[in-house]
């Protein structure tokens, strides 16, 4: 991640254009960036998945797709193999995303880069969370039934502990998640509100309690 930022004016990976929205990748096997993300003729607009931004590390930083699988906790994600999707004439670096079903080939969540405040090593807080084990709210295999953000009791019996742990990633038995911070350190956090000023790393802040999103 740091190598990429050093090569790209301190900016972290961000697929598409500066005005692309979070959505789907138009054509993950396209021959050029415009077709891959559905950009306009002037190079603006389009949409991209979060995983396509991570895939830029495959294209430009020599990271292998297998590096995006959590070997210790994610038993469902499989190493990306383009041949399984009928693509046999291109190398990994020729593509733009982890196939048509990227969630099956990437275990990690990445900060929301499609917005007014993308991460930069030059201007962002070193305590900012950059990447983390998969978001439980976007993971079809993770049960968040009954979880309430205003019930974060971490004391008492086993059920209380299991309750607040529902805000954690589904990997690692809901005990916490590995978080990569901007200053390059990785820490296993046992709660999801571990960002700057206790920001919840899995949710979008609505202006109220930053721990809830």
Question: Where are the predicted features?
Answer:
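Short, well-structured segments within or immediately adjacent to enzyme catalytic domains
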Residues: 1-213
